[in-house]
Amino acid sequence: MTQDKILILDFGSQVTRLIARRVREAHVYCELHSFDMPLDEIKAFNPKGIILSGGPNSVYESDYQADTGIFDLGIPVLGICYGMQFMAHHLGGEVQPGNQREFGYAQVKTIDSGLTRGIQDDAPNTLDVWMSHGDKVSKLPDGFAVIGDTPSCPIAMMENTEKQFYGIQFHPEVTHTKQGRALLNRFVLDICGAQPGWTMPNYIEEAVAKIREQVGSDEVILGLSGGVDSSVAAALIHRAIGDQLTCVFVDHGLLRLNEGKMVMDMFARNLGVKVIHVDAEGQFMAKLAGVTDPEKKRKIIGAEFIEVFDAEEKKLTNAKWLAQGTIYPDVIESAGAKTKKAHAIKSHHNVGGLPENMKLKLLEPLRDLFKDEVRELGVALGLPREMVYRHPFPGPGLGVRILGEVKKEYADLLRQADDIFIQELRNTTDENGTSWYDLTSQAFAVFLPVKSVGVMGDGRTYDYVVALRAVITSDFMTAHWAELPYSLLGRVSNRIINEVKGINRVVYDVSGKPPATIEWE
């Protein structure tokens, strides 16, 4: 089936892939390519329109230039943040450093235009947006008009109606920009005229064919954690190659309470996949002893996983591939985007935590999907809701939820505290009868390797502290902390302190992403 397509040129923003997610939400197929994609390849791709992403650099840096021939293709172009500056700079306008960096919420005053007509927030002709820029356009190119401004950014939006070129100095792809989807839909559906035809069933068909082509008759090992990503990856790969897939469930001593039994029962009942259960707690704990640096912990856990998989591979006659449930937020936070320009934040177990001498080839069928797309894919593959809508769990498990050195004692305490938190979230509902577990996107406890003084009965205690973390997000690239009811937090705190011997204080994390990441390590 021939589909209308949008091309996104990536200049290295941490949130570039959210643009692709928003376009896909409109059921329009899109691909994200490096900013230096050759013009002949762009022509061959034959997009209905082009979106230029944001990025951390200046238009005056020669290493970050796209082929300006894109402005001669006769198709609409939308520049976002750096993309707007690139457009202005190369079409005869001027870009200069701002007097102050603008980061966070801003209100843009708009005028009626092809891009903004009928789109506004609470006040007439205003948009509540998310800014993140230093440089700004100071002079318009010929043929352009200002269609939006802020007090510190007089040219916050611009357009050339004749050529259908548009520039916006904010990020419509992040959820903080309330009308961001509406603006992107206006560009993609109305201005570009793209017809919606991209659906998850179509994606499954293409992904299954690609997996079969990649793998051939080889056998595949998948590291099964029981989380959403590895579960959906297993279902998709099993759909493609059946019994060529063997799942390896590694109990590294850093799992949630009773997780081993739950995972084995769930997959035996729901997927019919071959699953090997490996008890490797002693091996992992020995390697992690004395290690406090989070990056080193991730690398060690990744390396030990490979050791386990290598051992299992020797038992299979034709194993050539290691499958993982890597999704795009894992990749972007490790600066693993195709441009290699995004600023690195931390390595991920599924990306930068793997050793270079790995003996198996990597199969990552979910690598370009966002979390909500992965869930949608899981439902389309026939997985039960209890599996698909389970909160994410990191590959290194509790190893990155125990700050500092990992010890069995700490893991046992954290497991109990985390289970109490999740129980109470499941058992508490809002006024509409929806559980707080379903209302939050991810929730967990974090073990802090510090002790605090407390009083229980008539005695003094000196025990450990746990932090509770709950966030709400649609894409895991940005997130708000969940405003849980005080009564719920109080019950969780009371239960943990009374039921988990060794913990006497509970705190709640009220940090958003950005500036914090969702996990503490």
Curated annotation (Swiss-Prot):
Pathway: Purine metabolism; GMP biosynthesis; GMP from XMP (L-Gln route): step 1/1. GO terms for cellular component: cytosol. One of its GO terms (molecular function) is GMP synthase activity. Its EC number is 6.3.5.2. ATP binds at S225, G226, G227, V228, D229, S230, S231. The keyword Methyltransferase does not apply. Residues 198-390 form the GMPS ATP-PPase domain. Keywords: ATP-binding, Glutamine amidotransferase, GMP biosynthesis, Ligase, Nucleotide-binding, Purine biosynthesis. The keyword ATP-binding applies. InterPro entries: Class_I_gatase-like, GATASE, GMP_synth_C, GMP_synth_GATase, GMP_synthase, GMPS_ATP_PPase_dom, NAD/GMP_synthase, Rossmann-like_a/b/a_fold. It catalyses: XMP + L-glutamine + ATP + H2O = GMP + L-glutamate + AMP + diphosphate + 2 H(+). Catalyzes the synthesis of GMP from XMP. NCBIfam families: guaA_Cterm, guaA_Nterm, PRK00074.1. Homodimer. This is GMP synthase [glutamine-hydrolyzing]. The gene is guaA.
